[in-house]
């Protein structure tokens, strides 16, 4: 997928090792307490930015901050508008600070894929798969009909949302972040 980007470069291997260990700690904590603590995410962010600056100066610092924004911003938006966890957003931002722009894009893609698969398996395990799929298909149908019907995206945004689930199904997304980080690391090693 990424043409063996890590095989011959020791520094990215060290960065991905930090990312995997931090994501594993976050996943285990999320499974146990349904929280990803600031005690993990804030030092992770600070050390990510610091190592980038020490390794490459201002350019490294800029790359680290852009990586933080690319990996973290989608999860900040999910936190603000869709009930995602703040810890998930902070963890993704901190991981992005360690990885910089290029590898944050790989991480984001792989975490999203892992999140979809893990989310569907989690819903199935809790007997809610049909309900979740119905909600997702209703949202897709309403949005597609609004856009194709000439109303455009602004019309789609004004549509009433799909009927809510009986009660929100909260999954420990730290697990999906760890699985996505594993997937991204594996794809970079191939």
What label would you give each PLM region?
Residues 1-190:
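A membrane-topology feature that recognizes alpha-helical transmembrane segments
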């Amino acid at each position: 997928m990424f043409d063996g980007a890590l095989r011959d470069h020791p520094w990215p291997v060290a960065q991905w090792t930090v990312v995997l260990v931090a994501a594993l700690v976050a996943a285990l904590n999320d499974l146990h307490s349904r929280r990803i603590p600031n005690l993990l995410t804030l030092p992770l962010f600070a050390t990510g930015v610091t190592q980038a600056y020490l390794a490459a100066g201002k350019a490294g610092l800029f790359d680290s901050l852009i990586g933080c924004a690319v990996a973290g911003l989608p999860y900040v938006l999910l936190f603000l508008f869709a009930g995602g966890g703040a810890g998930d957003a902070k963890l993704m931002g901190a991981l992005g600070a360690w990885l910089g722009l290029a590898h944050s894009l790989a991480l984001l893609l792989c975490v999203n894929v892992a999140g979809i698969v893990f989310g569907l398996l989690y819903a199935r395990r809790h007997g809610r798969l049909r309900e979740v799929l119905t909600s997702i298909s209703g949202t897709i149908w309403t949005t597609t009909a609004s856009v194709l019907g000439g109303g455009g995206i602004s019309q789609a945004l004004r549509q009433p949302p799909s009927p809510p689930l009986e009660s929100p199904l909260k999954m420990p997304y730290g697990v999906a972040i760890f699985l996505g980080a594993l997937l991204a690391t594996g794809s970079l090693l191939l």
